Swiss-Prot record:
Main subcellular location of this protein, as a coarse class: mitochondrion
InterPro entries recorded: NADH_Q_OxRdtase_chainM/4, NADH_UbQ_OxRdtase, ND/Mrp_TM
Gene, per the UniProt record: ND4
Name assigned to this protein: NADH-ubiquinone oxidoreductase chain 4
Biological processes, Gene Ontology terms: ATP synthesis coupled electron transport; electron transport coupled proton transport
UniProt source species: Acanthamoeba castellanii (Amoeba)
Length: 497
């Protein structure tokens, strides 16, 4: 067990070492050394991914610490002590899966940016490494104060990533929307943390799980945390910043934003709001269902009207994340397990869709839907990759999203038949805009010979596209293993009801 503790510290150390190496290249290197920086960053990111997989294999059969068994965390380590604030890291299988998603997307982002980031590549890699490090801490830290610090710190590198390497003139407007929407929302969580500290003199999550707050205090704390996390998800009607941020972000920024950052809000709901404020969760359940169902229907209808390819996927992401929140608040193992699975699936599928859109944008320099048609005749491999990802986006059986949405609907039917009926109807709307989008850009008659000037996937793009499609199908066929991993910690959360 001690080996696992030091192993985790080693992962954290490797992240910082990678960042320092990249910084040294940036300071002392010349523009001719950009290729060396690319190879070095790719090596470190891939090495970190191998490390976390190795840790996953090692920890699979290791028992939990006895004094920490009720939380089903596999380990914890206290580093810093400041008043009653502890920098404590810990991990259960849910944290581990989100870390796997983070470390999986990091080398993918470097491959995507290999030719698409044309300037200041050194600074871009520094930004990406620090995003990875902050995400590592968000998924592992066990103190609310430090969670809040890292939760807000992620805005800084994302602000730089979109503001510097964004694609159009409105990128500054987009990053200000991203920054201020999420910052103002998180101030509510800060107020909630202050209320908690004034009440029990600690913000340690392990203590909070055993603390019984009064009902009225729970209502206040639930509202402060819920709306802070819903802005980050984002849930309707707090979603205004997301389509603009996606449109202006580079492909890598969209992959990170859709793949991991949108999961921070739902992760916070699962880790803090639902198990700690149980009574308030039941009290506000009608409000949550109403917001989620309105968001699903509204975003599905809005998606059909969009003309920008990135906005289509952005609104689809809002719809899927509303589905996730529906599952989290079913308070049964099927719904919550389906939500966790759908979060992981959405991280893969939406990242793959934004990658495909980035590929055609790099060639044709436009994302307007009406300029695309008949791409199957010039980009057949791209068309096949997009087809697999579109199938997963509509939750086709055999793909990853099907398992998550099916479990969510199964759990929702146990609680509210009407909500489950509306959520099921939204799947039809998702299929409508997804299939129409694919048919419009892939199978329509080729009317512009300009498209014939460009080739299909390059070798690097083929590797990235193949990985996305392979993981999507693998999750769809072998999803039972992922479900078995998260069952134990989910039963622990349900025990707090």
């Amino acid at each position: 067990m001690a080996f696992l503790l030091y192993y985790t510290l080693f992962i954290s150390f490797m992240l910082w070492l990678a960042a320092l190496l990249i910084i040294s290249f940036s300071v002392y290197g010349s523009p001719e050394k950009v290729k060396l920086i690319k190879k070095t960053s790719l090596f470190f990111s891939f090495f970190q991914f191998i490390l976390i997989i190795f840790f996953w294999i090692l920890s699979d059969n290791i028992s939990v610490l006895a004094e920490f068994d009720i939380y089903n965390f596999q380990f914890y380590k206290q580093w810093l002590f400041l008043y009653n604030f502890h920098y404590v890291i810990g991990m259960d299988n849910i944290s581990l899966l989100f870390l796997l998603l983070t470390f999986f997307l990091t080398p993918i982002c470097i491959l995507i940016s290999w030719n698409s980031i044309k300037y200041r590549y050194n600074s871009f890699i520094i930004c990406l490494i620090f995003i990875t490090f902050i995400l590592f801490n968000i998924f592992c830290v066990l103190d609310l104060v430090f969670f809040y610090i890292f939760f807000e710190s992620i805005l800084i590198p994302m602000f730089i990533l979109i503001g510097v390497w964004g694609s159009r003139q409105r990128k500054i407007h987009a990053v200000y929307q991203l920054f201020f929407y999420t910052l103002l929302g998180s101030l509510l969580m800060l107020l909630g943390i202050l209320v908690i500290y004034s009440h029990i003199q600690t913000t340690d999550i392990r203590v909070l799980y055993n603390t019984n707050f009064s009902f009225y205090r729970q209502l206040i704390l639930w509202a402060s945390f819920f709306f802070a996390f819903c802005v980050k998800v984002p849930l309707f009607p707090f979603h205004i910043w997301l389509p603009e941020a996606h449109v202006e972000a580079p492909t890598v920024g969209s992959v990170i934003l859709a793949g991991v950052l949108l999961k921070l809000g739902t992760y916070g709901l699962l880790r803090f709001v639902i198990p700690i404020f149980c009574d308030a969760t039941y009290f506000f359940l009608p409000l949550v269902y109403t917001l989620c169902l309105l968001g699903i229907i509204y975003t599905c209808c809005s998606t059909i009207r969009q003309v920008d390819l990135k906005k289509v996927i952005a609104y689809a992401s809002v719809s899927h994340m509303s589905f996730v929140i529906l599952g989290l608040f079913t308070s049964n193992i099927q719904g919550i397990g389906g939500s966790v699975f759908l979060m992981l699936s959405h991280g893969i599928v939406s990242s793959g869709l934004f990658f495909c859109i980035g590929c055609v944008y790099d060639r044709y320099k436009t994302r307007i839907l009406r300029y695309y048609s008949g791409l199957v005749s010039t980009m057949p491999i791209f068309s096949l990759c997009l087809f697999i990802l579109i199938l997963s986006n509509i939750s086709f059986p055999g793909t990853s999203s099907f398992i998550g949405e099916f479990l969510i609907l199964l759990g929702l039917f146990e609680n509210n038949h009407f909500a489950a009926l509306i959520a099921t109807f939204s799947i039809i709307l998702t299929a409508v805009y997804s299939i129409w989008l694919y048919n419009r850009i892939i199978f329509n008659r080729l009317v512009v010979n300009y498209y014939l000037r460009f080739s299909d996937f390059s070798k690097k793009e083929f590797v990235v596209g193949f990985i996305f499609c392979f993981i999507t199908i693998l999750f769809g066929l072998k999803g039972s293993y992922i479900i078995s991993l998260i069952e134990a910690p989910l039963y622990v959360y349900l025990s707090f009801k």
